[in-house]
Amino acid sequence: MEFDVKDLSLAEEGLKRIEWAEMDMPVLRQIRERFSKEKPLKGKKISACLHVTTETANLMRTLKEGGAEVYLTASNPLSTQDDVAAALVKYFEIPVFAIRGEDRETYYKHLRAVIEKEPDVVIDDGADLISTLHKEYPGLAEKVLGGMEETTTGVIRLRAMAEQGVLKFPIIAVNDAYTKHMFDNRYGTGQSTIDGILRATNRLLAGSYFVVAGYGWCGKGVAQRARGMGAIVIVTEVDPIKALEARMDGFLVMPMEEAAKLGDFFVTVTGNIHVIRREHFEVMKDGAIVANSGHFNVEIDIPALEEMAVEKREIRKEVTEYKLKDGRRIYLLAEGRLVNLAAAEGHPASVMDMSFSNQALSAEYIVKHHKELEKKVYRVPREIDEAVARLKLNALGIKIDELTEEQKKYLSSWEMGT
């Protein structure tokens, strides 16, 4: 079996952590049990580009139990958990191509390795795999039945490809499932981002000014958790509706040029480029801490910070100190990459349980229905979204009401008024 991981001797520790995560992923476990009996993915190859974490490991196990031949590479050079990668290879015989801290050349070499397996279905996190597949392997792209995308950033890229008419196969935007973005993006990103910042810095949040750039679902989660820790939260936005929502939610709202003067902590969660840039670094206070929890390391203008610095050193693990000409110091966390995965362990398993259940069921849906789908981006089918929610409620021991026949009739009628 071909693979490329750091050290297979780490596998035993990785296995323990995979099993620990599985305990908090009851929905995916139920799907895996069904997949092992029905084999809905039998004979299909699935290449996945995802963060190599304990939760991802349980998704890979589920797909393999469903009969698929599975290959995994990392969607971020700093998010790979080397013990998990080793465990997948050693104990589950799943080929993994991922090493924490790999350089850009190795990252793309690993991407190409899973593409060259000629997959029938692809799973992506940020659209690097799918875009590389289209640019470098157009012939292989023609043979793909369909794919799934996990993130807001990736969905934006893939919708652009569809609009330009270059997308060669249908995509299911798993990110757009209610049981994904309302929970993973908000509660998962919120908790894990704060976790990453605290692990990296060991700083007190209470009483500090905490700037959140972007008030989408991820930004909402980060802002809520920072406030819960006692921080004074400032939100920056370009969307007037989201800015108004942030204000109504009780947060300070202002442009980044004003927030930059106040902030002790900064977190970008926009999916856009250079949200924090030179003019903002120029007015930040000494000791400002800057982090990213969007997808790529482009939200913070790191080249500008490098140019401004007269000295640079790693002062703590995942903390780089940039000393400016006037003596001020700015601290960049995790090289501007995903702080929740680089400095912590990513989202809790309980929330990834829903996201990855959507992935597994969407893979099954593509295999069954690919002939009916066009080359565009689709939402997760409502029946899958609701099935995941019901399974999660059952796992939590929660029951809900059902509409009566009278209520169903009322909702489908127009004649009854005041």
From Swiss-Prot:
Substrate binds at residues 53, 125, 150, 180, 184. It catalyses: S-adenosyl-L-homocysteine + H2O = L-homocysteine + adenosine. It is found in: Cytoplasm. One of its GO terms (molecular function) is adenosylhomocysteinase activity. Its cofactor is NAD(+). Gene3D superfamilies: Adenosylhomocysteinase-like, NAD(P)-binding Rossmann-like Domain. NAD(+) binds at residues 151-153, 185, 214-219, 237, 272, 293-295, 340. Binds 1 NAD(+) per subunit. Its main location: cytoplasm. InterPro entries: Adenosylhomocyst_ase-like_sf, Adenosylhomocysteinase-like, Ado_hCys_hydrolase_NAD-bd, NAD(P)-bd_dom_sf, S-Ado-L-homoCys_hydrolase_CS. GO terms for cellular component: cytosol. Keywords: Cytoplasm, Hydrolase, NAD, One-carbon metabolism. One of its GO terms (biological process) is L-homocysteine biosynthetic process. Pathway: Amino-acid biosynthesis; L-homocysteine biosynthesis; L-homocysteine from S-adenosyl-L-homocysteine: step 1/1. Pfam families: AdoHcyase, AdoHcyase_NAD. Its EC number is 3.13.2.1. Coiled coil: none annotated. May play a key role in the regulation of the intracellular concentration of adenosylhomocysteine. Belongs to the adenosylhomocysteinase family. This is Adenosylhomocysteinase. It comes from Aquifex aeolicus (strain VF5).
